[in-house]
Amino acid sequence: HYFVTEACGNTLTYYSQLPAQHPDDDSLDDMVTHIFYIFGKTLGQLHDYGLSHGRPAMRDITYDPDTDKITLLDWENGRRWPELTPQGWDLLIFVHSYLREDNLPISYLYAMMNGYSSARTARDTVLHVKEILRKHECLFKFCRMLNPFHFVDTEAAVKAYDFMLALKTE
């Protein structure tokens, strides 16, 4: 089964790569920072409503510059880590998806988190994710030992772990 949606812009993956493709255009960095901020705010609003996406990867999030609107595609019902709330899963999956790209500036991820922090539930969600990550520290130590093999997902898992634990929640 499939469904068709109205045109809703290009993906975050597309926009995130524009500044590197056009290094002479200084306005692109500001535009992409804005897009990630808007996405973070949108995800936070979704979480404030008690909803979750299920797998918000960069390829499943679009931005329409004409309307300044984010659209989330390819929703999923299941989680693969039952200890995490659906909102915690969303946040961790997006951070992992972003860091999986490896060549993107961390500033866009911080812009996303700045937008996300406007949500009522943001602080509790971040604290929840940090608690679960700390509880499973040995898993991430093991993933870190695999870094010399350059497995994309385990490297991104370690980066996501480090990023989330370093976030200020005060």
Please identify what each model-predicted range represents.
Residues 9, 65, 76-77:
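Short, flexible loop/turn elements at secondary-structure junctions
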Residues 4-7, 69-74:
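A short beta-strand motif that forms the metal-chelation/ATP-contact edge
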Residues 60-72:
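Conserved protein kinase catalytic/activation segment
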Residues 71, 75-170:
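C-lobe/activation-segment region of protein kinase-like
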Residues 42-46:
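Conserved hydrophobic alpha-helix
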Residues 47-58:
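Catalytic-loop of the protein kinase fold
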Residues 1-35:
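Conserved structural core of kinase catalytic domains
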